[in-house]
Amino acid sequence: MIDAAQVDHLARLARLELTPEERQSMQADLNSILGYFEQLRAVDTDGVEEMQRPEDLVNVLRDDVPGEVFPPEVVAALAPEMQGGFVRVPRTVEAE
């Protein structure tokens, strides 16, 4: 399991300054996490088929078919401002 020296090493790598209480807490937390991995490692998985996820997900796609197109007059009536037959919108990207 993880000892205090390893916790200190990890703290230095992560540039953390731990108090003695935080060091003890971190050591206990890391040992708990590693203990959980040991439990997982002990599970017999022989004969279990590998999978990426527990459910078979399938994308439901629709055909890309053009729908109703609004006449230019309707678009112009809905737009706040038109310029040269196009809808004018506020600038969203500033030039560098």
Curated annotation (Swiss-Prot):
Molecular-function annotations in GO: asparaginyl-tRNA synthase (glutamine-hydrolyzing) activity; ATP binding; glutaminyl-tRNA synthase (glutamine-hydrolyzing) activity
Superkingdom of origin: Bacteria
Catalytic reactions on record: L-glutamyl-tRNA(Gln) + L-glutamine + ATP + H2O = L-glutaminyl-tRNA(Gln) + L-glutamate + ADP + phosphate + H(+); L-aspartyl-tRNA(Asn) + L-glutamine + ATP + H2O = L-asparaginyl-tRNA(Asn) + L-glutamate + ADP + phosphate + 2 H(+)
EC code(s) of this entry: 6.3.5.-
GO biological process, one term: translation
Keyword terms of this UniProt record: ATP-binding, Ligase, Nucleotide-binding, Protein biosynthesis
Pfam family for this entry, one: GatC
InterPro entries tied to this protein: Asp/Glu-ADT_sf_sub_c, GatC
Family indicated by similarity: Belongs to the GatC family.
Subunit (UniProt): Heterotrimer of A, B and C subunits.
Purpose: Allows the formation of correctly charged Asn-tRNA(Asn) or Gln-tRNA(Gln) through the transamidation of misacylated Asp-tRNA(Asn) or Glu-tRNA(Gln) in organisms which lack either or both of asparaginyl-tRNA or glutaminyl-tRNA synthetases. The reaction takes place in the presence of glutamine and ATP through an activated phospho-Asp-tRNA(Asn) or phospho-Glu-tRNA(Gln).
Protein name per UniProt: Aspartyl/glutamyl-tRNA(Asn/Gln) amidotransferase subunit C
Source species of the chain: Deinococcus geothermalis (strain DSM 11300 / CIP 105573 / AG-3a)
Gene that encodes it: gatC
